[in-house]
Amino acid sequence: MAMKKLLIASLLFGSATVYGADGFVVKDIHFEGLQRVAVGAALLNMPVRVGDTVTDDDISNTIRALFATGNFEDVRVLRDGNTLIVQVKERPTIASITFSGNKSVKDDMLKQNLEASGVRVGEALDRTTISSIEKGLEDFYYSVGKYSASVKAVVTPLPRNRVDLKLVFTEGVSAKIQQINIVGNHAFTNDELISRFQLRDEVPWWNVVGDRKYQKQKLAGDLETLRSFYLDRGYARFNIDSTQVSLTPDKKGIYITINITEGEQYKLTDVVVNGNLAGHSAEVAQLTKIEPGELYNGSKVTKMEDNIKTMLGRYGYAYPRVSTQPEINDADKTVKLHVNIDAGNRFYVRRIKFEGNDTSKDSVLRREMRQMEGAWLGNAQVEQGKERLNRLGYFETVDVETQRVPGTADQVDVTYKVKERNTGTFNFGVGYGTESGVSFQAGVQQDNWLGTGYSVGISGTKNDYQTYTELSVTNPYFTVDGVSLGGRIFYNDFKADDADLSDYTNKSYGIDGTLGFPINENNSLRTGLGYVHNGLSNMQPQIAMWRYLDSMGLNPNTTDRASYSADDFTLNLGWTYNNLDRGYFPTSGNRTTLNGKVTIPGSDNEYYKLTLDSVQYVPINDDRTWVLLGRGRLGYADGLGGKEMPFYENFYAGGSSTVRGFGSNTIGPKAAYYNSNSYGCSNGTPICNSDDAVGGNAMAVASMELITPTPFISEKYANSVRTSLFMDAGTVWDTNWQNTAQTSMYDIPDYSKASNIRVSAGIALQWMSPLGPLVFSYANPIKKYEGDKSEQFQFNIGKTW
């Protein structure tokens, strides 16, 4: 439209000035119709100045130049003697931009696209651009299957040549796939092929991936899936001949027809390697080895190319070119592969840089690097550095880029870009519980103290049954070789009776230190010494507790309370294997920890204690939003030298860190008291059972969890929130328990059985909040026993095992 007016104006001017074809000298330029655009700005855009000799061509160029500014809807140039009169009609200015009816596309995204096209408040309205935007948005809706969608721009005039721009959306409904037909398939049925598609004409209730809503991008992906399916099974001549997508008259249904030619299956006969192998021909030969009579497989060919690139990358050849051309023999249905390799230059690392570590010091990140500056570039070492940074748990994301150094042929810089997360946990709370009464809790845990990598924690708890304080410090790099040093001091005043456990009070304090030794990238060992003083009092006569006191030579009366104190020195040992992909919210890998401690000479007690914890993450889909999580914990402890393990070292289960849905520490053996009349048992029985948990010297806990995408959470917070469905199982038992005629007479259960397994199932939500990790769970016990306590909703601050 604008060009049409330009042409008309030029013709009119030309016809009006035939007599002046030789030109004339401009003595003045006068504008008519300017409102928003200043005269000076308009003059700057004109190729004609006062004093110039102007021809018809100059006038035409002037009109084009003014139209090109985008400020005018119409431009006319007239002559009055030696004065140029420029008549313009300005485009209206956009006063506001609003949207209506858009549900699939957010306002912010629309504004970004409009601004990218030059449509923003304060700018001139270009109707041609608006029409293009309308069409582009409608094309977007068509691509996601909404064929009845429409987008209309409503322009409302305002005073002073301004307008309101409103985009009105009518999105309609997504067209659903009525039928998918594949024509030309003989070796495989339609159901076999379509079952691998994302788009489906039928979606079972359990299929969370399949979708009947048509999307152009998904169809393209499904066609590629179909192609790969055949190529991976030897059909080297497979071809998708055509694809038809038909729309029903009401635009609500889609019929898809895919015409294919399967061809025959082809076998591999040979692999021929050509090019610059950089002296690694033996390794290339190993990577390109094929089995006699093996079917052609497109995915294996791609994997072979990737393996060759990875191998060359280990030796510094960062940008190798590897391509494979299949030589197909239709006569005998065979394929010969020609692999062309160009290793290129060997690259060396000039610098390793870090970005985004505003808190963490460079040295904390640099010590995790396995790629060295000045050495040749090793892709495996660069990736190891990324994995180790992720495993620290200091960062939400870690990305790595390798950039060539300008002006050099063989140097690169490696840049690690991190996004730091809050590595500190601060909590302070006041609460009230039926067991704990008024409760105060405060704590600070910082896993990256002042950016040094030190882990420092101080915590305290005060309620009706416990007063606890602890200070801990760990230096993960006590030596440059990665030997860690950690220490802890604590004080605990614990009244077990008020915590609904077996009746006793224990005032304990202690100190321990630990050295950690890295063995390799994934394995480490720990050793340390510890001291603890346990001051036991108010011990009520209970079978398992008295059994321990008897083994210590105290032989207390079964009708009296008892007191005892013990000082123990322990040798602590541990081993950890860890190849998790990151320190928090992992998606793949395993972490297994074995810990043990044993008392050493000078201790009052003689016992050992072992625990094994293992966690395994298995991603289900490529983007790792669906992950299977398996967890297990085993524990066993026993006395030495004829003594029993102290009962206060027993294992417990139940609660948010073991078997969810059960009360904390309530699973397993219960206290059986002597002299029952004194402790509320009926009928004057000398022994009776209670609901007080006493724990046991053996424990087994397992969990299976399905981690799913969190609904209703934006992508911005996806890395901070995790949702899962779980099933937990666990048991605690006492291998030293012996049922006697007396315990059987009074119906005391056999607590030596490991088969009394509790089971629960539920849903959990974890949130890496600014205050630290928060864990919410709701679980329902499926299998429980007498004396167990249910606790369906549970909340926890801090990491769980």
UniProtKB/Swiss-Prot annotation:
Residues 24-91, 92-172, 175-263, 266-344, 347-421 form the POTRA domain. GO terms for cellular component: Bam protein complex. The keyword Chloroplast does not apply. It is found in: Cell outer membrane. The keyword Calcium does not apply. Keywords: Cell outer membrane, Membrane, Repeat, Signal, Transmembrane, Transmembrane beta strand. Residues 1-20 form the signal peptide. PANTHER family: OUTER MEMBRANE PROTEIN ASSEMBLY FACTOR BAMA (PTHR12815:SF23), SORTING AND ASSEMBLY MACHINERY SAMM50 PROTEIN FAMILY MEMBER (PTHR12815). Part of the Bam complex, which is composed of the outer membrane protein BamA, and four lipoproteins BamB, BamC, BamD and BamE. Belongs to the BamA family. This is Outer membrane protein assembly factor BamA. It comes from Serratia proteamaculans (strain 568). The lineage of its organism: Bacteria, Pseudomonadati, Pseudomonadota, Gammaproteobacteria, Enterobacterales. The gene is bamA.
